[in-house]
Amino acid sequence: MDLASLRAQQIELASSVCREDRLDKDPPAFIGGADVGFEQGGEVTRAAMVLLKYPSLELVEYKVARIATTMPYIPGFLSFREYPALLAAWEQLSQKPDLLFVDGHGISHPRRLGVASHFGLLVDVPTIGVAKKRLCGKFEPLSTEPGALSPLMDKGEQLAWVWRSKARCNPLFIATGHRVSTDSALAWVQRCMKGYRLPEPTRWADAVASGRPAFVRWQEIQR
């Protein structure tokens, strides 16, 4: 595994990330959610992609792709491991979203290329990274109240917003993926909340990927 080459690719790709608002359709008609997991001890990469109507946030389509994992887990290089399955699920969608939430980091990455940014560049779609853990940077401790907010900073640069979306829950790290500004990324996540820790697009992607009760109930209603 030539990590020096992958690192150079990350730096080059990161320079192409658009950190400004460049939505083709604003407000979007459809917002997507993406989540990646691994099965069979990491041998299989599973990506779930969902499509929600906006502003109702109603689930209208989902696709799950499973492919052989092509790369081991190496911190800081996760997007190279995850994007092939994401691309396979994306290509199955009959309708592509105008904005995509990705479970993972955007520019809040040591080389400014988390999976939300990498995938956004690959398919040239506006993306937002919604991560559950910090990868780099520092932030001031948040109060315990829902709505508590702090910028994630690294070397004098804001990489994300750290936002407590729900009481007694760990905060989310919300960042530009591609073609969405940092402030707009936060605003879009806030518009897509329905009382859970996660915004609806990534909550549904996780539900589909893991076969959670909410998704099972949705399937039963569709029958």
Curated annotation (Swiss-Prot):
It comes from the Bacteria. It holds the Pfam family Endonuclease_5. Mg(2+) binds at D35, D103. Its EC number is 3.1.21.7. Disulfide bonds: none annotated. Gene3D superfamilies: archaeoglobus fulgidus dsm 4304 superfamily. The record marks Y73 as: Interaction with target DNA. InterPro entries: Endonuclease-V (IPR007581). Its cofactor is Mg(2+). It catalyses: Endonucleolytic cleavage at apurinic or apyrimidinic sites to products with a 5'-phosphate. GO terms for cellular component: cytoplasm. One of its GO terms (biological process) is DNA repair. Keywords: Cytoplasm, DNA damage, DNA repair, Endonuclease, Hydrolase, Magnesium, Metal-binding, Nuclease. Coiled coil: none annotated. It is found in: Cytoplasm. One of its GO terms (molecular function) is single-stranded RNA binding. PANTHER family: ENDONUCLEASE V (PTHR28511:SF1). Belongs to the endonuclease V family. DNA repair enzyme involved in the repair of deaminated bases. Selectively cleaves double-stranded DNA at the second phosphodiester bond 3' to a deoxyinosine leaving behind the intact lesion on the nicked DNA. This is Endonuclease V. It comes from Salmonella paratyphi B (strain ATCC BAA-1250 / SPB7).
